[in-house]
Amino acid sequence: MKQLILFLLCLSTWTAQAKIYNVKDYGAKADGTTIDTPAINRAIEEAASQGGGTIYFPAGEYACYSIRLASHIHLYIEQGAQIVGAFPSATEGYDLAEPNEHTQFQDFGHSHWKNSLIWGIGLEDITISG
């Protein structure tokens, strides 16, 4: 009986972490024109609220601004899928750069992280594969 309970506990833990979140189910179009960032970030937020999971990118071109990672997230990019940095518009763009006391001594690209295509700070258990 103890072995059965232990097995079921392990199985439920594995199942919870193995959930797959298809970004198209959250509104991503993957047409190379539509900005898919909101859909991708919603999928990541949903997975994070459930303890983590796999964010699945089916084939297509995902035009994006800042994708915000969370702990225990696996980005799986299927063959034929691309995540492409989009050009900012007058009303949309990448996350604002965080304040940095050394800005006057370094160029912008080496001093800031939050305005990147894919970023996260203080996270653990992150993988990107495909």
Show the residue positions of the predicted features.
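Bacterial Sec-dependent N-terminal signal peptides
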Residues: 1-20
